[in-house]
Amino acid sequence: MSNRKSKNNIHAECLSQVQRILRERFCHHTPHSNLFGVQVQYKHLIELLKRTAIYGESNSLLIVGPRGSGKTTLLNHALKELMQIGDMSENVLQVHLNGLLQTNDKIALKEITRQLNLENVVGDKVFGSFAENLSFLLEALQKGNRTSSCPVIFILDEFDLFAHQKNQTLLYNLFDISQSAQTPIAVIGLTCRLDILELLEKRVKSRFSHRQIHLMNSFDFPQYLKIFKEQLSLPAEFPDKIFAEKWNENAHCLSEDSTVLEVLQKHFNVNKNLQSLHMLLMLALNRVTVTHPFMTSADLMEAQHLCSLDAKASIVHGLSVLEICLIIAMKHLNDIYEEEPFNFQMVYNEFQKFIQRKAHSVYNFEKPVVMKAFEHLQQLELIKPMERTSVNSQREYQLVKLLLDNTQIMNALQKYSNCPTDVRQWATSSLSWL
């Protein structure tokens, strides 16, 4: 009994480490795995960073590609390799900014000051402009001449959002410094906008080097399978070698399992970006426990089901019969008027036709009750108003549009427990009750 208990404790400890390592890999783009299909882009990026870090040469570059194409992973790989060269980790500074967080110049400047650990140097100094403040910060890092100054790598995530800020002051000053003989800096922007250069002001564009790296998900299914296996494998330095060997052997078996191959092929056909794969693996990893220590094909099938789940159709499963009836009435209105907007009164009239045809008093709700159910559907965002509601307009006559298509409605009704037969028949009828 005690042996089994100690074995469970060892398994629990190992699984805790597995969860930590893999979650970190899936969520934070940690540079563990090999890069696939981007060797040329990687070489270009690492050479540019080395020129800044080693030779004090300022540069600017944009990494452009759709979401999930591996922009952050590529950059993290390059930064990791750079920091492993000599004493680069001590001499090269990194400043990470995000367009979603640093929404104006003032916030960005505070974040730059914090990341460079220069709060004490700035103190209570008052600066006339953003450029003066930024120049002061970079001068504080200088040790003498250009080659011995401390290089700074600025990473601007969601770069296009910085382009929407007033006067593009941050971008202008960073690019301006990268063109002048001041502190050596590299400005690396990450964006999913292919038209990013069109967003830049003329003065900003003139100071940008126009270097761009484009990333596309160009790998095929065999490479996708290789990535799956590698992402799921534990590193060689994992403490428990025996457990790691078993885990990696299981990952290899999964990559050859016909059920898993079918799941991955379906996932690949829908969306082949790595974020989507990471989400699939994360959901499967959540099912791994002490009593179920290794991932199975069933876990991946369940994860695939959760990934492909229709959120709006899931909401329909929790609606009342009255709300279901209103959605069916709207479905018929869509069929009759060919997706044209409708109002509550039209939906109510359609619902009344159903009641009169069936002569069921059980569905005979008062109009205010039906109105309340209609408003609840609007709160759930299953229907949306076509125009802004005004104080004087009558609620019954405001135009709305249904945000569910016929397939979603019928699939949801199939899974709706205890749905009355006549309501189900009404939904499947091709014409409304006339």
From Swiss-Prot:
Gene3D superfamilies: P-loop containing nucleotide triphosphate hydrolases. The keyword Nucleotide-binding applies. GO terms for biological process: DNA replication; DNA replication initiation; polar body extrusion after meiotic divisions; protein polymerization. The modification N6-methyllysine is found at residue 7. ATP binds at residues 65-72. Keywords: ATP-binding, DNA replication, DNA-binding, Methylation, Nucleotide-binding, Nucleus. One of its GO terms (cellular component) is cytoplasm. Its main location: nucleus. The keyword Isomerase does not apply. Pfam families: AAA (PF00004), ORC4_C (PF14629). One of its GO terms (molecular function) is nucleotide binding. It is found in: Nucleus. Component of ORC, a complex composed of at least 6 subunits: ORC1, ORC2, ORC3, ORC4, ORC5 and ORC6. ORC is regulated in a cell-cycle dependent manner. It is sequentially assembled at the exit from anaphase of mitosis and disassembled as cells enter S phase. Interacts with DBF4. Interacts with POLQ. Belongs to the ORC4 family. Component of the origin recognition complex (ORC) that binds origins of replication. DNA-binding is ATP-dependent. The specific DNA sequences that define origins of replication have not been identified yet. ORC is required to assemble the pre-replication complex necessary to initiate DNA replication. Binds histone H3 and H4 trimethylation marks H3K9me3, H3K27me3 and H4K20me3. This is Origin recognition complex subunit 4. It comes from Rattus norvegicus (Rat).
